[in-house]
C-alpha cells in the first residue's frame, strides 16, 4: 500500500508517521511529474514513466491518493489521522481502474468538481 502526496505535503511529518506506523509507504510527487499517469507514479506493473516534464502550475490545494490499500487499512489510516489531530485534506482519492490512467492534475480537477458539488457550490 502506498500514499501519493504532493511534494509540499512531504514536510508534514505527522502524515508520514501515521503512514509508517501502518506500513504504508509515502511517495512524494514533485510538480514536474504531474504529466505522468497515476499508475506510473504509484509503480503499478504495466505503467512506465514517460519522458515528459510538467511545466504547468502546481495544484491549488493538497491532494492525497492511496494505491493498493484495502478498506480496512484505509479505515485504520483515517482513524489514526483523525486521532492525531492532523489538519484535514479536502482532496483524497483511492486509485481505481478508471483514474489510474489520469494525471495528478486530471484527478485533482475531478476531485475539486466533486467537492464543489457536495459542498453545494
What annotation goes with each model-predicted range?
Residues 53-84:
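Mid-chain, well-packed structural core segment of small domains
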Residues 1-6, 10-11:
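Single conserved hydrophobic/aromatic residue that forms the stacking wall/gate
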Residues 14, 48-53:
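Short secondary-structure capping micro-motifs at structural edges
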Residues 29-48:
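N-terminal beta-loop-helix "entrance" segment that forms/cooperates
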Residues 13-17, 21, 27, 73-121:
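Helix-rich interaction surfaces within compact, conserved domain-sized segments
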Residues 8, 32-34, 70, 96-100:
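Short beta-alpha junction loops
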Residues 16-18, 38-40, 54:
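N-terminal secretory signal peptides
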Amino acid at each position: 500500500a502506498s500514499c501519493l502526496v504532493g511534494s509540499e505535503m512531504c514536510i508534514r511529518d505527522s502524515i508520514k508517521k501515521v503512514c509508517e506506523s501502518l506500513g504504508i509507504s509515502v511517495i512524494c510527487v514533485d510538480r514536474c511529474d504531474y504529466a505522468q499517469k497515476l499508475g506510473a507514479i504509484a509503480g503499478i506493473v504495466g505503467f512506465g514513466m514517460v519522458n515528459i516534464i510538467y511545466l504547468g502550475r502546481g495544484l491549488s490545494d493538497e491532494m492525497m491518493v492511496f494505491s493498493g490499500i484495502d478498506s480496512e487499512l484505509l479505515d485504520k489510516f483515517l482513524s489514526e489521522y483523525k486521532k492525531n489531530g492532523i489538519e484535514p485534506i479536502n482532496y483524497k482519492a483511492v486509485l481505481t481502474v478508471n483514474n489510474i490512467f489520469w494525471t495528478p492534475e486530471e484527478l485533482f480537477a475531478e476531485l475539486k468538481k466533486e467537492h464543489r458539488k457536495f459542498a453545494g457550490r
